Amino acid sequence: MGATPAPRGLAEPLAVMQLALRSPGEAKVRYSNYRFSRLVASRLQLNDLDMASFPEILELDLASPSMQQSRPFNYQLRYVVAGYGLQTLFNDDGPGPYHHAIRPTGYDFHLDVVLPAAMERWRSDYRGMADHRQMLAASIIWLYRGRKDSCWLRRVPCTWDVVDALDALRSARAIADWGRLFALYPGW
C-alpha cells in the first residue's frame, strides 16, 4: 500500500488532525515533531472556511448539544470543566461575562503573581488526573493563553505528540467534547 496523499485544501493543523485520526502510523512519520499544544494553539489562525471541514474530520455533530445554547463555547467550556472534574483547576471568578469569567486557579490576577501554594496544588491535582483529563485541562489553558504556557503547565505532563493525544482522547471517549471546545472557541 502506498502513502496516503496529503489532503488538499486543508490548513496544516487540520491536515495533521485528519491524518492522525485516519492513519496514525503515517501521521507519526510525516509529522513526527508535531505536538498537541501546536494543534490547539493553531485554533486562532483557523478561519470559518478552514473550520468548515472540522466536523467531517472529527466525525462530529457540532449542532449537538452546545449549539443549542446562545453562547455555545461558554456552555461547552463549563460542561467540560464540570463533566471532567476540572473544578480544582478552574474557577468562575473572572471580571468578564460568560466564558471570560472562567480562569485557572493558582494565580492572583489582581496582583499579577503566582500564588506558590495554590499553584503547587494546581499542578498536583493536574498530575493526578488521567491523561485525557490532563489533555482537556491543557487545551483550556492553551486556548485561554492563546499560545503555549509556562505558568500553569510548567513541570507537568503536556508535551504529547498530536497522534498520541488524539488517540488518547478518542479512547477515553472525550474527543467529541475536546472537538467542540476547539471548534466553538471564539477567543478569550
Residues covered by each model-derived region:
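Extended, charge-biased low-complexity segments
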Residues: 1-127, 134, 145-188
